[in-house]
Amino acid sequence: MGQKVNPIGLRLGINRNWESRWFPTKASLPENIGEDYKIRAFLKKKLYYAGISQILIERTAKKLRVTVVAARPGIIIGKKGQDVENLKNDVSKLIGKEVNVNIKEERKAQASAQLAAENVAMQLEKRVAFRRAMKKVIQGAQKSGAKGIKISVAGRLGGAEMARTEWYLEGRVPLHTLRAKIDYGVAEAHTTYGNIGIKVWIFKGEVLQKGVQPEKTEDDAPKKTRRPRRGK
């Protein structure tokens, strides 16, 4: 079922950390989940052109810290950091709590699955051919060090009357290997013919714990020599 499940959720606690990091009580759980959803939806909409790849939310007993990882942090920060203060006030008003907002730069933006999906969506909305858009993103990811990338687009591609799914795969994307570090992103392109869904999987290599050796293949295993049978 590795082909069906979200690869990020499948690898939580193995080689992927949670994006919401807090320990709730039974009473506070629904409220915290609702606040996290509101914060992410608000920031994604407001800062769309900054290229947000991840939004981390951390809570302590009295404090709430939001870390925004973006490809273009300068757009968010503004002159002398004034835009960050305004953003902090907007988020605080949204949930009615004091919030601390930090901005981090996404060093390898082309190797981020979420940014890759949004890039394809933006090109499709500008009427770029879907195959050309997919190939351009794949080339960028490979230059950034990705070991494998798969892109899937589904909908009325090229204005066709019947919706279909097309995908490209370069390198290898082992979805069943839990130690494989796989990034996953989803986006939607709103075109005149309807919505087109985009999914991106990026394989960044295998993560092995200290002292754990990679599995040996049949070629690496020592071959057993058979002793000649003695005749009776």
Curated annotation (Swiss-Prot):
One of its GO terms (cellular component) is cytosolic small ribosomal subunit. It comes from the Bacteria. One of its GO terms (molecular function) is structural constituent of ribosome. Residues 213-223 have a biased composition (Basic and acidic residues). InterPro entries: KH_dom, KH_dom-like_a/b, KH_dom_type_2, KH_sf_prok-type, Ribosomal_S3_C_sf, Ribosomal_uS3_bac-typ, Ribosomal_uS3_C, Ribosomal_uS3_CS. It holds the Pfam family Ribosomal_S3_C. One of its GO terms (biological process) is translation. Residues 39-107 form the KH type-2 domain. Gene3D superfamilies: 3.30.300.20, Ribosomal protein S3, C-terminal domain. CDD domains: KH-II_30S_S3. Keywords: Ribonucleoprotein, Ribosomal protein, RNA-binding, rRNA-binding. HAMAP family: Ribosomal_uS3_B. Part of the 30S ribosomal subunit. Forms a tight complex with proteins S10 and S14. Binds the lower part of the 30S subunit head. Binds mRNA in the 70S ribosome, positioning it for translation. This is Small ribosomal subunit protein uS3.
